[in-house]
A protein has these predicted regions:
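Helical hinge/lid and interdomain linker segments adjacent to catalytic or ligand-binding clefts
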Residues: 114-186
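Hydrophobic targeting/anchoring helices
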Residues: 1-133
Length: 188
């Protein structure tokens, strides 16, 4: 249907806006789409709407950049023209460029989020913001050294069998309470 995609990584202020999106989503959504369709994610875009302090705007840029996109796009020129965020971002982008020249591909705990699944709203992103390096994927990460399974992972009927094979092969798994509750009747 489409040749490529571009990812909106705006998270705004998670406390005062209606979206309540954790900031780590700026990173995890990029890695999710890159893992879904490698090489076809053109980049990440973010805006300055509902970012009441400069740090909120800059954090969207940092987290998007750390996902190693092909490019960053600053959305909505009219809202950025003559705005205090732009000089601050320019200053930080120079530093990010120097840092990212030495960074490799994003790695971390593989969080299995199958397509079209509902679960614990963004729990992986909250875990990311407290320091767990979470990288999201729509495919069961059987080769990953460590995985995170949430209620969203439980929407796949054979996920418990996949988990059993993974752990039997010496993989390390972290599961959430939501995953356990959703799979109790499947032998977890």
């Amino acid at each position: 249907l489409f040749d490529n995609l571009y990812t909106g990584t705006e998270t705004r202020d998670p406390v005062t806006t209606d979206q309540h999106l954790p900031r780590y989503l700026s990173y995890s959504l990029m890695t999710y789409f890159e893992n879904m369709w490698p090489g076809h994610n053109g980049g990440g875009w973010f805006d300055n709407f509902d970012t009441h302090v400069t740090e909120h705007y800059l954090e969207q840029a940092y987290l998007t950049a750390f996902s190693k996109p092909k490019e960053l796009m600053l959305f909505c020129f009219q809202s950025l023209y003559d705005n205090v965020y732009v000089p601050a971002l320019g200053f930080q982008l120079d530093k990010l460029d120097a840092l990212l020249d030495h960074a490799g591909k994003p790695v971390g705990i593989a969080c299995y989020l199958p397509d079209n699944c509902q679960g614990e709203d963004n729990i992986q992103d909250f875990l990311g913001m407290v320091g767990l390096p979470v990288v999201c994927t729509p495919y069961f990460p059987k080769e990953a050294p460590a995985i995170l399974l949430t209620r969203s992972s439980a929407c796949v009927p054979d996920v418990v069998q996949k988990l059993e094979r993974y752990v039997a092969a010496r993989g390390r798994a972290l599961v959430t309470r939501g995953f356990v509750e959703a799979t109790m009747d499947r032998g977890i």
